[in-house]
Every structure is written in C-alpha cells, then in structure tokens.
Regions:
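A SIS-like phosphosugar-recognition module
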Residues: 1-167
C-alpha cells in the first residue's frame, strides 16, 4: 500500500541526500496503522451517515489539492464513477473559483478534502466561500486531515501521511 510505496520513495530520496529524516520518519510511523484503524473506526459513523444521505444525489462535487489531489481523483473518478456509476465532478481548490463555484447550488453535495501542505490556504479559501451560505447549498461537507491526530508524529511528516488518513 501507500506505506511501502512511500517508504521506498523516501528511502531513495534519503540515499540521494534529499530526505535526511528518513530514519526518524520510519521510527515515528512504525505503528501508524493502529492509529489509522482508530481514525477509521471513529469516522465510520459519519461515513455511513454521508453515504445514506447522498447515495441518490444526481451528482456530487469533490474539491481537493496538493497531497490530497490524488485521493480526490481516486475516490471521485475511480470509486464512485467507474465502480458505482455515480456522477461526480472533481476540481482542485486552485481551480474552484474559475467557474466551478457556479455549479454549487442547493441539492448538490460538495465535499472539500483539506490537507496539511502548502495548498491549505487555497482549501481554506474554498471553505470560507462554501460556508458563507451565498450559494444556498447546505450540503457542504468538509473532511480535514488535521482533525485526526496521530500521536508521536512530527508535524513535518503530516503532509506525507495525510493521503493515508483521507484514504
């Protein structure tokens, strides 16, 4: 999964002198899956509620950026569109204000995936717009990886594990 692929890539970077904190990362993530399981268990009731609420929505919008952009596409296109034949629209936080905001209207569920990297300011800008209520849409759902603690993990490593959290 992600852990092995990321560790492999980070080790290669380490060997080239580009990720000197590799050993520290490995030490701090050795038990990360116990925390991931806990996160999943805590989120499961919300996930079930969202699934029931939006299962029959005509289409759903997913917004993400940076380290979470791959997960945004994976869930929207691969899981919902290709596997479940659900109509979705995935958009980056940076592109949201270039027309997509006009598609936000009552009855259209919107999910904003907020990460912890340099794109967070863009995510916060989208959140501010969506939660102001100017579109009349009340189906705004924000999933912020910063809300899910991983004890013993340095903040510098959260950007690496935020896709794991979202998945």
């Amino acid at each position: 999964g992600y852990y092995l692929a990321d560790c492999f890539g980070l080790r290669l970077l380490n060997r080239r002198g580009c990720f000197p904190q590799f050993d520290k990362f490995i030490e701090q993530t050795k038990d990360v899956w116990t925390h991931m399981l806990d996160i999943r268990k805590r989120f499961e009731p919300r996930a079930e509620e969202l699934a029931k609420k939006y299962a029959l929505a005509p289409y759903t919008m997913f917004i993400g950026s940076g380290a979470l952009w791959g997960e945004t596409i994976l869930f929207s296109m691969c899981i919902l569109e290709e596997m479940q034949w659900k109509r979705t629209r995935y958009i980056t936080s940076a592109d949201f204000f270039h027309g997509t905001l006009e598609l936000v209207e009552p009855g259209v569920p919107v999910f904003l995936f907020m990460g912890e990297d340099e794109n967070r300011k863009l995510d916060e800008r989208v959140r501010a717009f969506l939660t102001r209520g100017v579109t009349g849409d009340t189906d705004i759902n924000i999933i912020d990886t910063a809300e899910f603690a991983i004890p013993g993990l340095d903040d510098d490593f959260r950007v690496i594990v935020s896709p794991w959290i979202l998945t």
